[in-house]
Amino acid sequence: MDWCGPWRTWYKEHLFTPAQAVQQIKSGQRVVVAHACGEPSIILDALVAHAAQYENVEIIHMVAMGKAAYCQPQYDKNFHHNAFFLGGSTRAAAAEGRVDFTPVYFSEIPSLLREDLRPNVTLLQCSPPDAHGYVSLGVSVDYTKPAAEASDLVIAQVNQNMPRTLGDSFLHVTQIGCLVEADTPVIELAPPKIGDVERAIGENVASLVRDGDTLQLGIGAIPDAVLLFLKEKNDLGIHTEMFSDGVVELVEAGVITNKAKTLHRGQSVATFLMGTCRLYDYVNNNPAVAMYPVDYVNDPYVIGQNDNLVSINSCVQVDIMGQVVSTSAGLRQISGVGGQVDFVRGANLSKGGRAIMAMPSTTGKGKISKIVPFLDQGSAVTTTRNEVNYVITEYGIAKLKGKSLRQRAEALIRIAHPDFRDELTAEFRRRYPRDY
């Protein structure tokens, strides 16, 4: 590399070791950590290793893919974690009251960080700079770029393995105060196991997808199962908060072309990525993939500019009126809203759009119905009954849009697990004793 020029001088003068970089963080400060697979693990490890020098550092994060060691009890006086989403490494600490949870739509996190929770420091991971001094945020643009732009200090792990994604995904090195070179593997998310139930759900969902539709897919076995049954479709598009390896397969098969899109034609649009090296190799320097901050990608009014936008999400529980719970089990917080509501609303604004909730009919090894007469006490409604168009299980499709409460209940009971239909029907008869 030619190290001549102003930005190159900046780069050399702002190179730090991980230990040196975290020395710039002070007690009482607010630190935002890049999202999901963009998490700079080497910097977080250094932060925790130097925990003794900190007191009450607030750490804001969404999906934590690493160990989230800062949540461990021995660091309660050093770090305070404020989560926008709970996962496997943070859920138990939240249940014990050692982690705070802040409910917020994914699309609104950037404005929250600019106005209400302005960070002192942002920790992120990026690609090496190009000839002009720009680094790409790679797999995590979402709230990471807005946080960096709002922060007093940015500490970045510069990683040769981070794919250089295109779009509005760049920072200039002169926006970064501490640069830490470390070529660690980018965090990967292995493809989920898809069982018979997920396959049946995927086939039912795919039956509602038409040639030329634009898709939003969530994370997990059900979205991946849907992709298995789209191989006979044509000219599908992608406008989604995230995608994984399954999308790459459909691109290579010629199913996803983005040719019919009415916004960003020819490009798959996302705000973060979770997958394996196959995905990361595909998106690297690929102009067919455009990454933008989440306040753009997940803006319902932007989403709605895509005709025939099909949002496909999953949930924890649905009552027989069509109210959806996706983030809690009673009073126990288990995840976060993410982009579900953003895309449900966007699908409803889209010409020809469809908002789909897809889930197994039961949980707890088949002992608990996910379609219920009443939501569990304390559960927070994620998506209202006014916004869901379809609910899908392995037993079929319930169309709710335009249906009365009576008709919704009848449709949802039909797709419930057979073991629970009598119980649901009894409640239905109590509410609606008169036949029409």
Regions found by a protein language model. Name each.
Residues 1-436:
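Conserved alpha/beta enzyme-core scaffold
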